[in-house]
Amino acid sequence: SKQCCHLAACRFGCTPCCW
């Protein structure tokens, strides 16, 4: 899975969410 750290991380299917 992608690893993202932005406000919409969960909505874009990224994991983990950093907030």
From Swiss-Prot:
List of residues that carry 4-hydroxyproline: P16
Keyword annotations from UniProtKB, A to Z: Disulfide bond, Hydroxylation, Neurotoxin, Secreted, Toxin
Keyword Disulfide bond among record annotations: yes
Intrachain disulfide bonds: C4-C18, C5-C14, C10-C17
GO cellular component: extracellular region
Location in or out of the cell: Secreted
Domain of life of the source: Eukaryota
A GO molecular-function descriptor: toxin activity
Keyword Disulfide bond carried by entry: yes
Tissue distribution: Expressed by the venom duct.
Main subcellular localisation: secreted
Family, as annotated: Belongs to the conotoxin M superfamily.
Entry note about domains: The cysteine framework is III (CC-C-C-CC).
Function as written in the Swiss-Prot or TrEMBL entry: Intracranial injection into mice causes scratching and hyperactivity.
Protein name: Conotoxin mr3b
